[in-house]
Regions:
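Non-catalytic terminal/accessory segments
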Residues: 1-415
Length: 415
């Protein structure tokens, strides 16, 4: 980068370069300017200097954010994702990097989303253990959090952790950046922070830290919770307590400009062999896992009993099945067997690593479908394998020679 001059804002150049490295590592699609990461890197030094120069002088104004509809994680409908330009992503990452060391020490230990050293499966595990200790759960659904969060309160929580002028300036500008839809129309907004931006996760966590986490710890210290971004579960000792806490949370959300979804926020009874009471709701979904009564086996005695356990949710299973179908594995006869495995394994292993942590047998039908698609692929690729007898012999030989060729063979080898 060229030599710096005095600027109103002291933003270190190495910070901009590190922000670029993080953006480059995540890759991602181009924004409204249609500039890809590769095109940005073709003139990297000048592009990074331009970002630093404009941010340091206070003259950086974010372009519109490209609006893209994407399926919600774990098969929960669709939401609008905001895709910033590569340059804007780097600028946002600079601010996120400034805020993260300030806010991380403040955050509640049961806030799991978008935080270093924490993951969704950590939240699932904590929830699993607490469902054994607490009989009741409040399954919270904050309605359209990322679309409705109030800008003035977002700025207020940022001001609570820093008085850095350039951070506050650019947070305000990013909040006000319009969405550009596929037809080119611009949607001006007066609230919300688009998902997909580099700075949204830290802003969302900071907002909910004050709006929910800290408030819960102060008002209801005996009701532990797990929160991943705007998805949260609260544990209670009795139905009466759960109803009271739910109503107080709803009131708190109204105070900060949010709403609990009236239909999706539910009180659930964690019934099992030792908790035989009845309630209209005995299951809930959290981070792609369906928690409900399931058959379990005592490892020491072999005794069967009912436990309240998580497993891949029907919605997540359908989303994975739809993705599997869309891959059209049986049509990829242009690939060799080894190349097919290299292409397919990261996808299947991703499902197994996440959804197979608990009650993995719920995934077996999906993994058997992978084998069925492989059978169809083999029949199209090799004419001699079109009869079942010949295919079965080939399959058995392949399993013996290369037992680790396909990721799902660790758990399921039949079809």
């Amino acid at each position: 980068m060229p030599k710096p001059k005095d600027k109103p804002f002291a933003i270190p150049k190495p910070m901009v370069r590190e922000a670029y490295r993080r953006v480059a590592a995540n890759k991602g699609a181009p924004g409204v300017d249609e500039v890809t990461l590769g095109e940005f890197e073709a003139d990297l030094e000048n592009n990074l200097y331009r970002i630093w120069n404009r941010m340091s002088s206070g003259s950086y104004f974010p372009p519109p954010v490209r609006a893209v509809e994407i399926p919600k994680p774990h098969g929960g409908g669709v939401r609008v994702l905001g895709v910033p330009t590569i340059a804007d992503r780097i600028a946002q990452t600079v601010v996120a990097m400034y805020l993260e060391p300030l806010v991380e020490p403040r955050f509640h230990p049961d806030s799991y989303g978008y935080r270093p050293g924490k993951a969704a499966l950590d939240a699932v595990e904590t929830c699993r253990r607490r469902c054994w200790k607490f009989d009741w759960v409040i399954d919270l659904d904050v309605q359209e959090f990322f679309d409705t969060v109030r800008w003035d309160l977002v700025v207020k929580v940022v001001e609570a952790v820093t008085d850095c002028r350039w951070v506050l300036l650019y947070v305000k500008r990013w909040l006000a950046a319009p969405l550009q839809h596929p037809d080119g129309t611009l949607q001006e907004r007066d609230r919300g922070t688009p998902q997909g931006s580099a700075v949204s996760p830290v802003l969302a966590n900071l907002f909910l830290h004050y709006a929910f986490d800290q408030w819960m710890a102060r008002k209801f210290p005996g009701c532990p919770f797990e929160r991943y971004a705007d998805d949260a579960v609260v544990h209670c000792k009795s139905r009466r307590q759960a109803e009271y806490v739910r109503d107080k949370i709803a009131q708190r959300m109204r105070e900060v400009g949010l709403r609990l979804h009236p239909d999706k926020t539910r009180i659930v009874y964690c019934c099992d062999s030792s908790r035989r009471g009845e309630h209209e709701q005995a299951s809930f979904t959290f981070l792609g896992y369906a928690f409900r009564p399931r058959e379990a086996v005592n490892g020491r005695t072999g005794e069967h009993f009912t436990s309240f356990l998580p497993a891949i949710s029907p919605e997540a299973l359908k989303a994975a099945s739809d993705r599997l179908r869309a891959l059209r594995i049986h049509r990829r006869t242009d690939l060799s067997l080894d190349d097919l495995a290299r292409w397919l394994n990261p996808i299947v292993a991703g499902w197994m690593n996440y959804y197979g942590r608990y009650y993995r047998s719920e995934m077996y039908p999906l993994l058997r479908r992978v084998s069925l698609y492989l059978r169809r692929w083999a029949g199209k690729k090799y004419r001699r394998l079109r009869t079942y007898k010949r295919f079965k012999r080939w399959w058995a030989g392949l399993l013996k020679r290369e037992p680790g060729l396909f990721a799902h063979w660790r758990w399921v080898r039949a079809f």
